[in-house]
C-alpha cells in the first residue's frame, strides 16, 4: 500500500476533532442511549491484509444501531435470490428522514432502500421467513466476521427501543397494508431492535466490515462473505444511502461508502484497502456522528483517499 499509517496519525486526528465535542447531541429519543457519555471518541482501521490501527476509545463497545442494517442485508443476500430482495425494497436514496411514513405511503409500501427504517424492517421480515432463530443467527454471523466470540445484544437498549416503537410499528403495519410485510409485526420488531442493540467497538466493527474492502472476502475467513458483485452493490448503497439524508454532504466531505448509526458510530470503506470505524455519540441534526464525520474527513485528506 502506498501510504504509511500508525496509531500516532489517528491520535492526531482525534486531537483535531475533539473541540467539536459539545456541539452535538446524543440520541435522546432512545432513553437507553441518552445516558451515554458524549465525550467518548474513538477510531480504528483494519486493512485487507489484517493490519490494525486504533486511537482513543477504539476498544469500548457501544450500540451500533443502524450500522446493523448492512449486516442484516448481508445475511438476507445469503438466503434470497437478488430479484426477490429488490422487488420488496429499492436501491435509491430517500432524501427523507430515516423513519418517514409519508414517502412510504406515496410509494405503496416499497421502501426506497434497505438502510432506512422501513427498508431494514422489510429485510428483517424476509429473514423471519428463512431463519428459525434470526437473532441467534445474526450473533453467529457477526461473531464469525469479527473473530470475537462474546459479542452480544444490549438487552436494555433493545427493550428501551421496543417500548418506544410506535413509529416503527406504524411503518411495519403500513407496509403490511400494502402486502409488503408478511410476518408478525411485534416479532419482527423485536429482531430489528436486537440487531440495532448489538454492542461492538470501533476495532470490532472495522474487522467485521473489512470484507467490503476486499471484494467480499475477509483475511481471517476461509469462505467469501458475499460475492464481489454483492460487495460492490453494498458499497454503492452505502455511498448513496448510508448517511441518512446527508449522503451528498458526506460524499462531498469524505468521499467513501459509509453507514452510520444514532449510537454515534460510522463504518467507512476504502475499497481494496481498509475498513474504518469511528465513534462519537454526539450527533448532528441528521443523526450522524458530528465528530465522527470530521475525523473521517481528516483521515481521507491525510491519506488522499476517495472513491470519487
Swiss-Prot record:
User: Of which family is this protein a member?
Assistant: Belongs to the glutaminase family.
Q: What quaternary arrangement does the UniProt entry report?
A: Homotetramer.
Write down what this protein is called. Answer: Glutaminase
Pfam families from the entry?
Answer: Glutaminase
The family database entries (HAMAP family) matched by this protein are listed as: Glutaminase
What top-level class of enzyme does the UniProt entry assign?
hydrolase
GO MF term list = glutaminase activity
Catalyzed reaction equations: L-glutamine + H2O = L-glutamate + NH4(+)
Keyword line: Hydrolase
* Residues at which substrate binds: 66, 117, 161, 168, 192, 244, 262
Q: Which processes are annotated in GO (biological process)?
A: glutamate biosynthetic process; glutamine catabolic process
Q: What Enzyme Commission number(s) does the record list for this chain?
A: 3.5.1.2
Q: Which domain of life is it from?
A: Bacteria
